[in-house]
Every structure is written in structure tokens, then in C-alpha cells.
């Protein structure tokens, strides 16, 4: 390839949802996301861009019930957390809120917390950005 485009990370993640208010409340209470931008079409809220206080990935929620139902169950992305302690703390927080998940496991290059599902059934995974120690 003679031309290599300059890329600069992931701009945002977008999920289709069936109920904006329910999804907003869930992402706020689980992870601390807050509204950065509200997308209004013909006077109707159709989506939100959510920001995280620690600078985690921007998450966009888009009202699109048909796509939300079709996408349920798939893990589109993994959100990074700094280290094993942070992912264990997150798992404990989710458990306290009554959320089902698969627990923290050692994975190929770090620690993973899979099996968490948002109100529309999207699997939200977390992976440590700190790799496992060398063996």
C-alpha cells in the first residue's frame, strides 16, 4: 500500500436503543456517563452523545428500535479499564446494582469482564489496558 492514512483512535461508539431514557439512566448509573450532546430531529430527541468524566470513550445512543432488537446479544466493542483492580471494582459495582455478568477472567492479553448486557441486550465487555505480567 503506497498511501497509509493517518488514523487517530476511535472517535465514538454508537449503539441503537429502543428507549433513550432507559438506556441513558442505565449508562449513567453503571458507568457515570453524562450527556454531552443531544440530537433532536423535528423537536423529538433521537439520540445522545455521552461523555465519561475520566475521558473514556464517547458513547452515542441512537433511538432505533428495529436495529436495537437485531443487534441484541452481540459484543461490538470492549471498553478499556486501567488494571485488574479497576475491573474487579467495576464487577463488584455491577453486582451491587443487581446486574448479571460473567465475572473477571484472565484472557489472552489482560483481564476481561464479559457477559454484561445493557437494557437492549447489547453485550458490553471490559478489558484491562494494562497487559498481563510476562510469564
What are the residue ranges of the model-derived segments?
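Vicinal oxygen chelate
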Residues: 1-6, 9-18, 38, 48-49, 68-135
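Acetyl-CoA-dependent GNAT
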Residues: 62-67, 128-131
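Conserved N-terminal glycine/acidic-rich loop preference
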Residues: 1-7, 14, 46-48, 61
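Core segments of cupin and vicinal oxygen chelate
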Residues: 16-58
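Short amphipathic beta-strand starts and helix->beta connectors
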Residues: 59-64, 99
Amino acid at each position: 500500500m503506497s498511501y497509509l492514512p493517518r488514523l487517530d483512535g476511535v472517535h465514538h461508539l454508537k449503539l441503537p436503543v429502543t428507549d433513550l431514557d432507559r438506556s441513558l439512566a442505565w449508562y449513567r448509573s453503571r458507568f457515570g456517563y453524562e450527556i454531552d450532546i443531544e440530537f433532536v430531529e423535528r423537536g423529538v430527541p433521537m439520540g445522545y452523545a455521552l461523555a465519561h468524566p475520566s475521558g473514556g470513550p464517547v458513547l452515542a445512543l441512537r433511538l432505533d428500535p428495529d436495529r436495537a432488537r437485531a443487534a441484541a446479544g452481540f459484543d461490538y466493542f470492549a471498553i478499556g479499564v486501567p488494571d485488574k483492580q479497576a475491573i474487579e471494582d467495576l464487577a463488584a459495582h455491577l453486582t451491587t446494582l443487581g446486574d448479571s455478568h460473567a465475572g473477571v477472567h484472565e484472557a489472552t492479553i489482560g483481564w476481561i469482564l464479559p457477559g454484561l448486557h445493557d437494557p437492549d441486550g447489547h453485550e458490553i465487555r471490559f478489558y484491562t489496558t494494562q497487559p498481563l505480567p510476562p510469564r
